[in-house]
A protein has these predicted regions:
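Alpha-helical scaffold domains
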Residues: 1-138
Length: 138
């Protein structure tokens, strides 16, 4: 990936890491079969630490304007990546004293608005568990 990747580059990188055997395990674990709670969810077969490594490498400079493309992905892990980028950015702002920092307040509000706009894309318990307490719980 480039130093400042686009959403498409992040998706392409994550797709290049696909693991078919792990994909099958995840699809069973997250109940993606007909009539199950995760019906239709698609997986690349990446483990959460792999996704967190991607987030760690891109989150600092990743533009919020690129996050919706990640959140709209058919891939579960790519949506998780988008959510964790929002969490990372939000947590960084949450550590600041916001009383007199209008820019930080606006940034935090922008992240919250974006999260709520795409909340339906957090469509499985793990996506909710890893993002809601960190953003909406503050």
């Amino acid at each position: 990936m480039s130093k400042n990747p686009t959403a498409r580059e992040v998706i392409a990188y994550m797709e290049s890491q696909q693991n078919e055997s792990q994909r099958q395990v995840l699809m069973r674990f997250f109940k993606t079969g007909p009539g199950e709670y995760g019906e239709g969810d698609e997986f690349l077969g990446l483990k959460v630490p792999q996704t967190r490594e991607v987030v760690k490498s891109v989150a600092k400079d990743f533009p919020l304007s690129e996050v919706p493309e990640l959140l709209m992905s058919c891939w579960h892990e790519v949506r998780l990546c988008g959510l964790l980028i929002l969490v990372t950015k939000f947590e960084k702002l949450a550590t600041k004293r916001l009383e007199n920092d209008e820019a930080a307040i606006r940034s935090r509000d922008e992240i919250l608005t974006l999260y709520l706009q795409y909340a339906e894309r957090a469509n499985n318990w793990d996506l909710v568990d890893l993002s809601v307490p960190k953003i909406l719980g503050h």
